[in-house]
């Protein structure tokens, strides 16, 4: 029998494949079933307006599960960004390349409670450091709906610049290219 190290409550053994990252206020960790209760309202509400619109329960679950499955398939995926003080999910940040994406993308979602607190910026910075450091990626973009002013502002705060020549999954998407960080 294979011995596995103990995992935090609510995490399945496959979650051990997801690297945990820490920032000043957050822990970026694998999604757990408990996080679904914070994730679902984001994708099933108007908060998903710039991500192809709000989804039904099945569509939201498919997104949640694919973000975790991506770790097993590609060694990249989404993290739940949880506050250190209470382990409450306040954002979901990750690196993925679904089959329809021409390049690997850094993306983010915030819960209503997490909006405007700087959590997505903090978590995305940690994800960028990991992507260009230990993970060894050489390029990373964010695909953003041109109406999503908050995400455009966040991408620019992260140092990304528009790349109008890049391929994109949706014709209207803006592509923001993140500068490579020192490993």
Where are these regions (language model features)?
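Acyl-donor (CoA/ACP) binding surface of acyl/acetyltransferases
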Residues: 1-50, 61-69, 78-183
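Extracellular/periplasmic catalytic domains that process cell-envelope and extracellular macromolecules
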Residues: 72
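Conserved phosphate/ATP/ADP-binding segment of small-molecule kinases
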Residues: 57-58
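Beta-strand acidic-aromatic groove motif in beta-rich domains, primarily in extracellular
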Residues: 75
